[in-house]
Amino acid sequence: MIQMQTTLDVADNTGARAVMCIKVLGGSKRRYAGIGDIIKVSVKDAAPRGRVKKGEIYNAVVVRTAKGVRRKDGSLIRFGGNAAVLLNAKLEPIGTRIFGPVTRELRTERFMKIVSLAPEVL
């Protein structure tokens, strides 16, 4: 469950280490984002020679949350922290590698690239 001011780890090789959610996209009164939702983020910590710089603003898709995701069979998949993958204006991943597991809920037409790059799909 991600809301404004939530800090997230970055699960790709763009050079960003930490980002902060500045807006949950998808409606004017929308408060929370879960796995598979698109948010607007600001880069708070970045590697020196990465693709992105501190202070830049990007779209991102949430790939892991500490709150987890409930499946139809009743099982719950939780993670140790919150993580996102940075996207460009066309909602394509900026990075070429994804670190850590992602969930099967990302297997929509929009995010198949992220699922194919991920080392593990839960």
From Swiss-Prot:
GO terms for cellular component: cytosolic large ribosomal subunit. Keywords: Ribonucleoprotein, Ribosomal protein, RNA-binding, rRNA-binding. GO terms for molecular function: large ribosomal subunit rRNA binding; structural constituent of ribosome. InterPro entries: Ribosomal_uL14, Ribosomal_uL14_bac-type, Ribosomal_uL14_CS, Ribosomal_uL14_sf. SMART domains: Ribosomal_L14. SUPFAM superfamilies: Ribosomal protein L14. Part of the 50S ribosomal subunit. Forms a cluster with proteins L3 and L19. In the 70S ribosome, L14 and L19 interact and together make contacts with the 16S rRNA in bridges B5 and B8. Belongs to the universal ribosomal protein uL14 family. This is Large ribosomal subunit protein uL14. It comes from Bordetella pertussis (strain Tohama I / ATCC BAA-589 / NCTC 13251). The gene is rplN.
